[in-house]
Regions:
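Membrane-interface coil-to-helix junctions
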Residues: 1-61, 83-108, 219-220
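Short, intrinsically disordered/low-complexity patches at protein termini
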Residues: 34-36, 116, 176
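Membrane-interface helix-loop-helix junctions at transmembrane boundaries of multi-pass membrane enzymes
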Residues: 170-182
Length: 220
């Protein structure tokens, strides 16, 4: 309705309660890069919906294929992983809850880049490390921008735990440990910059909540 009126980035939703900030809601996908699919003028709304779902299923399959190749699986295993993940019930069923379908589509790129990083760390390949940082950060950022920061946080926790385990194990050299910590810092910085348009409005809107200044303990 807003798009038909020429308002592609609505800032206020007056139909939710007494009014609500659209950018301030963490589940809104206002700045998600694939959102313009919903504005294609030559398609009907059901066709846009179908295109959006199919595109993300293809992205999910591609991401898992990327992860499978980084794990050195053969072509048959990689293709099986692509089909079994993209068409699995937990992923395919999210066509009815699109923000989770969007985040599921980027998980493969997230963990595939981590596998690439571990290999690059072992062989001290700086270019491969840099590529892994970019792919990992952008995949996490896409999860946040699509309105599912919870999955992004879960992936970030698993990634941080894996990297910390890698750099602080046994006889790891100081240089390798510093590179691992540098990866975490670089990834966090890049994610914060890419998603600033998302988390800054959410943080500012949260400051309007009475719970921010409340001294009452809940449920007591």
């Amino acid at each position: 309705r807003c798009a038909s009126a020429g308002e592609y980035f609505p800032l206020w939703n007056r139909r939710e309660g007494l009014g609500n900030s659209v950018p301030g809601q963490v589940s809104s996908a206002l700045y998600y890069p694939l959102r313009p699919i919903w504005f294609l003028p030559w398609l009907s709304l059901p066709q846009r919906y179908a295109l959006f779902v199919v595109l993300h299923i293809l992205v999910a399959a591609t991401g898992i294929g990327f992860a499978a190749r980084r794990l050195a699986l053969n072509k048959t295993a990689a293709k099986f992983a692509m089909v079994s993940y993209a068409l699995s019930c937990p992923v395919l069923f999210q066509q009815y809850n699109l923000i989770y379908l969007c985040s599921a589509a980027w998980i493969g790129f997230c963990f595939g880049s981590l596998s690439d990083l571990w290999r690059a760390q072992y062989h001290e390949q700086r270019l491969a490390c840099g590529r892994s940082i970019v792919i990992f950060s952008l995949s996490i950022s896409m999860m946040i921008l699509c309105g599912d920061p919870h999955t992004a946080v879960n992936c970030g926790i698993l990634a941080a735990a894996g990297i910390l385990l890698l750099i602080f194990r046994g006889q790891t050299r100081i240089e390798s440990r510093m590179r691992g910590l540098g990866f975490l810092l670089s990834a966090a910085t890049l994610i914060a910059l890419v998603t600033a348009v998302r988390w800054i409005p959410a943080w500012r809107w949260s400051q309007h909540s009475n719970r921010v200044e409340s001294t009452v303990t809940p449920f007591l």
